[in-house]
Amino acid sequence: MTRYKATISYDGYAFAGFQRQSHARSVQEEIEKTLTRLNKGQTITVHGAGRTDSGVHALGQVIHFDLPYQMDEEKLRFALDTQSPEDIDVISIELVADDFHCRYAKHSKTYEFILDRGRPKNPMRRHYATHFPYPLDVERMQIAIKKLEGTHDFTGFTASGTSVEDKVRTITEASLIVDETGQFLTFTFSGNGFLYKQIRNMVGTLLKIGNNRMPVEQIDLILEKKDRQLAGPTAAPNGLYLKEIRYEE
């Protein structure tokens, strides 16, 4: 068997997430269907580095899969790209070692969350940015977001029901910028891994702080008490993008 690593992007609007679902459309299933066709009907299993939720987009998701033969990488990329649905793009494909695993190989991820605070709301952006038409103190949010950097137990920012026991993660970058029009805010988070709905919960909390409904110090309290009830609501998925995955050499 020959193992390939691929970088893909997708519009998450019409997907129930990356991971295969029993009764809903998923990115994993669509790519597996295309690869199976290319492999003359023999089933190919795809593994993903991250499991994006329903409605979440990806600019640089990484997958790997095995084929029973070796094929020119660009020809394989072109075939997979052109035969996959329009809301999936295959950016690159490369041959990797047989023991490479996109999920377990040491890597870091970068996510972006796009917020649209324009009024009136632009319906053309509704699937690709989360609308928030309320007042925001950006400076307060920029102070608060820096408190998330470093190694912490992020239990207080995790959705209930997660089976992960170790909730300690390291965030190497947490930043917030505003575009020149003042309409769009981009939250950026980079780290060695993120918990279930962690980023959306952090953004929801930062919006509460920016709206003066929580103090800046609320971040410290959530990290200290590890209590989800102290954090803000979960932000909508449509503004979230898996931007990049970087592997250590």
From Swiss-Prot:
It catalyses: uridine(38/39/40) in tRNA = pseudouridine(38/39/40) in tRNA. Its EC number is 5.4.99.12. Keywords: Isomerase, tRNA processing. CDD domains: PseudoU_synth_EcTruA. Substrate binds at residue 111. It is an enzyme of class 5 (isomerase). GO terms for molecular function: RNA binding; tRNA pseudouridine(38-40) synthase activity. GO terms for biological process: tRNA pseudouridine synthesis. It comes from the Bacteria. PANTHER family: PSEUDOURIDYLATE SYNTHASE, TRNA PSEUDOURIDINE SYNTHASE-LIKE 1. Homodimer. Formation of pseudouridine at positions 38, 39 and 40 in the anticodon stem and loop of transfer RNAs. This is tRNA pseudouridine synthase A.
